[in-house]
Design a protein with these regions (language model features):
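Terminal intrinsically disordered, low-complexity extensions flanking WD-repeat/beta-propeller proteins
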Residues: 43-46, 54-55, 65-66, 75-78, ...
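Blade-edge beta-strand/turn elements of extracellular beta-propeller
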Residues: 1, 34-50, 95-97
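Acidic, glycine-rich loop-and-beta core segments that form the ion-binding/anion-interacting portion
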Residues: 1-36
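Residue-level detector of conserved, well-ordered beta-strand and adjacent loop positions
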Residues: 20, 49, 69, 101
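A near-ubiquitous, low-amplitude feature marking generic local secondary-structure context
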Residues: 2, 11, 41, 51, ...
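Canonical WD40 repeat/beta-propeller blade segments in eukaryotic WD-repeat proteins
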Residues: 4-17, 53-60, 105-112
């Protein structure tokens, strides 16, 4: 399926035919297992590019089947929404909806909180002389995934 060194993989718990892989080539590949060719090989349905180093972790968001996040050696966590990609386009830049840049070192792991909407814990190897890493708790702004009209109505109150 993927030519480069694959570092991580995650099945979509809601759309179980979707699989995401992250690799050394800085890309997140989305695969649709219903689209295997006769020899059992697959071509990614989307290639998400927004990191400058290898992908170290990824996970689908438990509350929405089109959303996933990827962490990488570039110290970033990107949140993607593949429903924003035009069906007739190879341009996947619209899928990047949020980027967490709070870490100073390689992102080694993260977990979505299954009960707190858009909340995540992330771990980074800060590469300090004392060793060890950091854990951050953070939340993607709810307005990233709210319809524009609802956001405007809410902001007009202020």
């Amino acid at each position: 399926m993927q030519c480069q060194d694959v570092h991580c993989v995650d099945w979509n718990a809601i759309d179980t035919h979707l699989l995401a892989t992250g690799s050394a080539d800085h890309a997140v590949n989305i695969w649709d297992m219903r689209k295997l060719d006769k020899s059992g090989k697959a071509t990614p349905v989307y290639v998400l590019e927004g990191h400058t180093n290898g992908i170290t972790s990824l996970q689908w968001y438990p509350g929405q089947s089109s959303v996933l996040a990827s962490g990488a050696s570039d110290s970033l966590i990107n949140v993607w929404d593949i429903s924003r990609i035009q069906s007739d386009s190879n341009d996947t830049t619209a899928a990047l909806v949020f980027q967490h840049s709070g870490h100073r070192g390689e992102v080694t792991d993260f977990q979505w909180n299954a009960t707190e909407k858009w909340t995540m814990l992330s771990v980074s190897d800060e590469s300090q002389p004392s060793g060890g890493g950091t854990v951050q708790a953070w939340r993607v702004n709810d307005m990233v995934y709210t319809d524009e009209e609802k956001v405007l109505q809410e902001l007009q109150q202020y």
